[in-house]
Amino acid sequence: MNRITIIGGGNIGLSLARGLVKAAYCDASSITITRRNLSSLEEEKKDGFNVSDQNPEAISDADYIVLAILPQQIRKVMDEIAPTLRADQTIISVASGVSCADIKEVLGQDKVVIRAMPNTAIAIGQSMTCISTDQADQEKIDEVSKMFESVGSVVVINEDLMTSATALCACGIAFFLRGIRAASQGGVEIGFHAHDALKMAIQTAKGAADLLLQMGSHPESEIDKVTSPKGCTIAGLNEMEHNGFSSAFIKGIKLSAKKAGGLYND
């Protein structure tokens, strides 16, 4: 069984570790999680995970090393682990805006590097994860894809689209959550109690997403089914569009993509 070291015990790192075990991809004993403050990993230790505050030691027997840290912190961590790395270890980076070339510049050109961009729905096994690489072979790509498929869906993309994937999938989950919040606030405006309005908005959003996933249909074809001539749905949609709904959404995604591309150098 492959051994995995996850450097960074934050939300993404811990969710990945727990998701892999829950999906029976591997045992907790096969995973080591590192964090500077070990007291925050007490629960994981009790659940059978290996924990450490020493990154070089933690990666010594790992087959896969996941860099689950902020882009602003990754250079320091790479400098720390570079002397310990072996050529047969695979590096998986989930840091936004840090290219395979950036990583190899520090860790060595002989290293196998694969980038992955999950989102916070990884905590419930529903992440949308995009994967890319520069030169990793198909076997490695398939293995990393299998790893992340245990915690959601996976799409393999070209590396030059990874900052775009960050905006659409990682930042995107916040955009959709803000839309749900706005819908619930609208529900309160028209007479519902806040908790009822939120429940209704959440389930409606879930139903809309499941319709597209299960029917394989396009959003507009499903919209057409609920818009009748002179009806209330088309009136509401047109009011939103007149106030820039789609335009604001698109502009937000584009700006997030631009920002994501510069995080490593900020």
Please identify what each model-predicted range represents:
Residues 1-53, 57, 126, 188-190:
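NAD(P)+-binding Rossmann beta1-loop-alpha1 motif at the extreme N-terminus of oxidoreductases
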Residues 31, 58, 74, 193-201, ...:
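Small-residue helix-packing motif on alpha-helices
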Residues 202-266:
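NAD(P)-dependent Rossmann-like dehydrogenase/reductase catalytic/cofactor-binding core
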Residues 16, 38, 47, 55-60, ...:
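Rossmann-like NAD(P)(H) cofactor-binding subdomain of soluble oxidoreductases
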Residues 4, 162-167, 219-224:
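Short pre-catalytic strand/loop immediately N-terminal to key active-site residues, enriched for Gly-Thr
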Residues 117-122, 167-176:
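Glycine/serine-rich anion-binding loops at beta->alpha junctions
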